[in-house]
């Protein structure tokens, strides 16, 4: 694969990873709220490393519990569910901040991957970051900004410490709302139940979406705290999400929804393997057997050292 195709693949992978985080509807904690319209609630325990510490209802169409499994009760009017009420309460929120942790489990029940994610919105602009740690203990940190540009949103991959950003793609629509972070589509059939996470019991609501079952736990004041996803075909828990912080209202986005001062922006041409900065200067990527690639300016000067952040990014995305 040509270098610029590899670069394009890395950029796309990073952009898609962020899209998956925001579109999956996973997550949960209404903790750390306070006054001024911010959701509040108790601070939950960290996600268990052992999924056996999470006691969920049986996977079936019925509602009766079996043995130590909790019972599911149909919610007659899903519009009165805590999930729907949360979505309704914050449907118009144009500034917020969410901090979450997700754990993905392997078929043997062990932790296959953990993700620490943050999402923020202010007006039409959005920010999402995710730090991923796999079984190889190698961490990937991806930050992205979706900035409104006339009728579309430009998505930038942000390299904060190097004060650089690459435009990865443009989108016609961005749905980053508090409700969408919990459930990307409001279900039409739901059940209520009570489940245990470690020693603590929580009121929870269950619904199915395609071949997956979602169980969302709530604090006493109606804020999401955990969400668990099970594969209905494999009949096993595949992920658990904890919302560590949910805040809504003026000032809660923490200044994340804009490019940091002094950031240099670049667009990437995946047909030519070149970067173009805001002033129109073009930088070309060329393969190098020793370092992987080199970067040259329009005069043919080697400026690779000025783009070390890009080298580090490619190494991170390729697992090196």
Feature roles, as predicted:
Residues 153-154, 173-183, 225-226, 248-257, ...:
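Short, surface-exposed linear segments at secondary-structure transitions and domain or protein termini
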Residues 90-97, 118-127, 146-154, 198-202, ...:
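Short, solvent-exposed coil/turn segments at beta-strand boundaries
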Residues 1-22:
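Sec-dependent bacterial lipoprotein signal peptides
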Residues 129-143, 195-266, 270-277, 282:
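Gly/Pro-enriched, hydrophobic low-complexity segments
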Residues 23-126, 252-320:
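N-terminal leader/targeting segments and the immediate start of mature chains
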Residues 84-86, 186-196:
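Short amphipathic beta-strand and strand-loop transition segments with alternating hydrophobic
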Residues 70-75, 163-169, 173-175, 202, ...:
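Tryptophan-centered short beta-strand motifs
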Residues 111-180, 225, 236-239:
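An acidic-aromatic
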